[in-house]
Design a protein with these regions (language model features):
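Acidic (Asp/Glu)-rich catalytic clusters
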Residues: 20-27, 47-69, 94-104, 132-139, ...
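Active-site acidic/histidine proton-transfer and metal-coordination neighborhood
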Residues: 78-175
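Short, electropositive alpha-helical surface patch
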Residues: 82-95, 120-132, 157-167, 193-199, ...
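Conserved active-site loop/cleft motifs that coordinate metal ions or position small ligands
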Residues: 32, 210-213, 252-259
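Active-site beta-loop-alpha junctions enriched in small/polar residues
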Residues: 7-11, 36-38, 73-75, 113-115, ...
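Acidic/histidine-rich catalytic cores of soluble enzymes
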Residues: 133-229
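N-terminal pre-domain/capping segments
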Residues: 1-70, 78-95, 281-297
Length: 297
């Protein structure tokens, strides 16, 4: 079964229930959210009543809580060797894992981090040490996201992810989130997704892939830019992304859209329809703007 959804907001007054309602309005059967702003440490207390109502509504709509994912905030950088920033990142990630547990969500997506000039190997060592401190304290599975290689990002190659995972003690609590834009910008050919998956399989990592971020890219392959584009409107292209979404080896894995808003309006309902129909809609952007404008009148 196709599991398709998008990033949605997690708001103070509605929390998980509100995130679910928005996802359902897009025609989603999975979704992703941050438990607070990704750029700061401000976090609201989790409301158990809202969580319970959301869980009931998920069952009514045949949505499995196991298919919902949380994204860790960007300010966490496990690769940074600066002692105070490193300790902050470890402690904050532990808190985020705990929030996932309270919500009943078992997967947390993490950008591995940036080595900030210390070198990839030092960055990888820092990430491994941090994960070996964090994972024994949580039931949450941390999914390392494939990165575009912007700046000093770690995790830009499959081999770097392999090295991190090999160093982690509790391997059952570590996984991978593919990002199609990041892979393409990192110089992988999304048009040959099977070769990419063959490489994961060669390293015994295929079963570690637990989520896919489906994004087109504004930039050409190997650009190391990380600028997402709407499905079919970028350099990767609609057919190549459809081949990822419907690839048999990625079946039953949540596919999450993180594509940009169009003039302030969410594109996800129409993008999901397009994906389900497997037919590119070259008028999608205009239609999103029209629907959004009509609602605001």
């Amino acid at each position: 079964m196709l599991k398709i959804g998008s990033h949605v907001s997690f708001k103070k007054d509605t929390q998980l229930l509100g995130a679910l309602d928005v996802a359902l309005s897009y025609g989603s059967n999975t979704f992703m959210f941050y438990t607070g702003a990704p750029q700061n440490t401000n976090r609201v207390d989790l409301n158990p009543d809202l969580t319970e109502k959301a869980l009931i509504k998920m069952k009514e709509n045949n949505i499995n809580i196991k298919d919902i994912v949380v994204h860790a905030p960007y300010i966490i950088n496990l690769a940074n060797g600066d002692e105070s920033k490193y300790k902050f990142s470890i402690n904050f990630l532990k808190q985020e894992c705990k929030r996932c547990e309270v919500l009943g969500i078992d997967k947390l997506i993490l950008h591995p981090g940036s080595h900030v000039g210390q070198g990839v190997e030092v960055g990888i060592k820092n990430i491994i040490n941090a994960l070996n401190e964090i994972l024994p304290t949580t039931k949450t599975t941390i999914l390392l996201e494939t990165m575009a290689g912007k700046g000093s990002e770690v995790g830009k190659t499959i081999e770097e992810l392999k090295e991190i995972i090999e160093g982690v003690s509790e391997k059952e609590k570590i996984g991978i989130c593919l990002d199609t834009c990041h892979l393409s910008d990192g110089d992988y050919d999304i048009g040959d997704i099977d070769s990419i998956l063959d490489t994961f399989e060669k390293y015994n990592l295929l079963s570690k892939i637990k989520c896919v971020h489906v994004n087109d890219s504004k930039n050409i392959k190997g650009s190391h830019k990380d600028r997402h584009e709407n499905i079919g409107f970028g350099e990767i292209g609609f057919e190549n992304l459809i081949n990822v979404i419907y690839n048999k080896r990625l079946e039953n894995i949540p596919k999450i859209l993180e594509t940009p808003y169009i003039e302030g309006f969410a594109p996800y309902k129409l993008e999901i329809e397009m994906i389900r129909n497997k037919k590119f809609n070259d008028k999608l952007k205009e239609e999103v703007i029209k629907i959004g404008s009509d609602k605001n009148e």
